[in-house]
């Protein structure tokens, strides 16, 4: 809670590197900690009058209220606050765009975290750009690019010669300074040099050759499913959700869009995206120029951390290396069942506890079906299969749990988890 554990200390050290060159690199969430830890009464009063002023405030009311009466109350209370004289300008700070890669190492005596991150910086849309349909299209294109990269890296993990255990790819942003594309490689045997070499090579392959149309279509379909689920949640907004959207509009100029308009805009822009357009993002999403290599390590494994010089040498060698084109997948996965399935019948139905129904099938399987009240923003069907009987040794239990995770990760038959 005091932010003095290993994770918090590592996060602060990482932020100093990620935001380097910006005022944010010297500030915590609530400001310059030297001032926070030592300010006097007058400093606090001056800060209040400098920033807590009418032109930087908004009152947002959401609920079943008398609109006219509520507006009168707000005007009565707020209109007496005087306008600030010679108001301070609200500055927007940036992170400088570099033309060379950067390196950072963060560690802590108590941390167990061992990882290698590649962070690629892209421009953050301006206030004017955020209010356009183009901003929606750009964000959708980034999401499709992300899904293609995730699928490609997931395939790379499975290779016998993979040089890392796993790579996690995410999109993000640093305040309103920069958008980011971040890859976190988890090393084998704490070997961060090998992990860095491996992820650099896989990213360079993407940068050189891009993605195929088949990869694009699969990723776009996945983004479409994700957006559909998000739109259903958007449509089921609570008052708190609505208030949050209006706050985003006021503080970040993110326009509030009705559910119908949002559904239409997302659908139109996603349908209009092309493989060539998304492949065109490679320059900003995978270029080593301006890339940050950020290594997190426990102190006991510092001998396996690449130095700054070693990291830059690896970047240069990968840029010059011969890298084969990615292997294209063969035919798409076929149906789950290749033989005709003979349907059974429900031979008995009865009421079960907790409002459920019990169906006995002709093959003896019992199905318990229960409909639960809808939770706002959550629409899903949960299925659990249980087979009773038989014997298992204690030593088998661990393997059974491992098998569950294996199936969940690898998929079924020719169908992967995507």
Region spans (language model):
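Acidic/histidine-enriched segments that form metal/cofactor-coordinating
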Residues: 1-47, 96, 102, 140, ...
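M16/insulysin-pitrilysin zinc metalloprotease superfamily fold
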Residues: 156, 173-232, 254-255, 268-272, ...
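A structural supersecondary motif
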Residues: 119, 146-186, 245
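Extended, domain-scale alpha-helical bundle/helix-rich regions
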Residues: 271-304
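Short amphipathic beta-strand starts and helix->beta connectors
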Residues: 38-47, 162-170, 276-279, 418
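His/Glu-rich zincin catalytic helix
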Residues: 45-161, 196-200, 297-418
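Acidic/histidine-enriched alpha-helical segments
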Residues: 1, 66, 85-99, 162-171, ...
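Second-shell loop/turn segments in exported
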Residues: 1, 29-37, 56-64, 130-138, ...
């Amino acid at each position: 809670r005091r932010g003095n554990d290993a994770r918090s200390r590592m996060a602060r050290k990482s932020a100093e590197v990620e935001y380097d060159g910006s005022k944010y690199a010297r500030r915590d969430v609530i400001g310059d900690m030297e001032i926070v830890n030592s300010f006097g009464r007058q400093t606090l009063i001056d800060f209040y009058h400098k920033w807590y002023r009418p032109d930087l405030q908004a009152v947002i009311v959401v609920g079943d209220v008398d609109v006219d009466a509520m507006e009168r109350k707000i005007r009565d209370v707020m209109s007496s606050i005087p306008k600030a004289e010679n108001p301070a300008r609200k500055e927007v700070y940036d992170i400088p765009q570099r033309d060379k890669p950067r390196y950072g190492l963060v560690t802590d005596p108590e941390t167990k975290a061992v990882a290698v991150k590649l962070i690629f910086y892209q421009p953050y849309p301006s206030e004017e750009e955020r209010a356009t349909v183009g901003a929606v299209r750009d964000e959708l294109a980034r999401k499709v690019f992300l899904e293609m990269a995730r699928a490609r890296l997931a395939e790379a993990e499975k290779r016998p010669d993979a040089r890392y255990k796993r790579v996690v790819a995410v999109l993000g942003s640093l305040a309103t300074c920069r958008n980011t594309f971040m890859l976190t490689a988890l090393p084998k045997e704490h070997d961060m040099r090998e992990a860095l070499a491996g992820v650099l090579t896989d990213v360079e392959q993407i940068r050189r050759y891009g993605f195929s149309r088949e990869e694009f279509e699969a990723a776009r379909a996945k983004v479409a499913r994700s957006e559909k689920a998000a739109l259903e949640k958007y449509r089921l907004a609570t008052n708190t959700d609505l208030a949050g959207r209006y706050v985003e509009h006021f503080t970040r100029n993110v326009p509030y869009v009705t559910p119908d308009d949002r559904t239409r805009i997302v659908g139109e822009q996603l349908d209009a995206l092309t493989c060539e357009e998304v492949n065109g993002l490679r320059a900003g999403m995978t270029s080593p120029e301006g890339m940050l290599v950020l290594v997190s390590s426990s102190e006991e494994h510092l001998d396996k951390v690449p130095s700054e010089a070693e990291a830059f040498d690896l970047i240069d060698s990968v840029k010059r290396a011969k890298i084969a084109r990615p292997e294209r997948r063969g035919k798409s996965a076929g149906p789950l069942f290749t033989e005709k399935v003979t349907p059974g019948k429900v031979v008995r139905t009865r009421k079960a506890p907790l409002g459920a129904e019990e169906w006995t099938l002709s093959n003896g399987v019992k199905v318990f079906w229960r409909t639960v009240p809808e939770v706002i923003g959550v629409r899903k069907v949960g299925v659990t299969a249980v087979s009773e009987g038989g014997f298992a040794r204690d030593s088998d239990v661990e393997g059974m749990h491992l098998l569950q995770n294996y199936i969940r990760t690898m998929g079924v038959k020719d169908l992967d988890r995507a």
